Amino acid sequence: MTGDRGMIIHLVRSGGFGGMRREVRIETLSLPRGEREPLEGLVRAAGFFSLPEKFPKPGKGADFFTYSITVEDGERRHTVEVSQPSLPDGLRPLIREVSKRL
């Protein structure tokens, strides 16, 4: 549980057509409770702090997005880097939700 500390979520999305880079930093304590709790729940549901730091890149393909997402929760800090085709199902809802703020 995050208690009163909240989480800090930093997402960088790069690549895609044109190779654009966009990023967002969310401090969940600054969000209304109705947004904060579901977002923090997505971090927990993804098992984020147990995910590997990097996922294998696909052998073929171009114009995919690459995501680097870092979550800080108190003393814990973890970063995951993954390209769009390698995005695990458990992480998709978190990436989708945070990407809405890009």
Residue spans for each PLM region:
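Function-determining sites in protein domains
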Residues: M1-L102
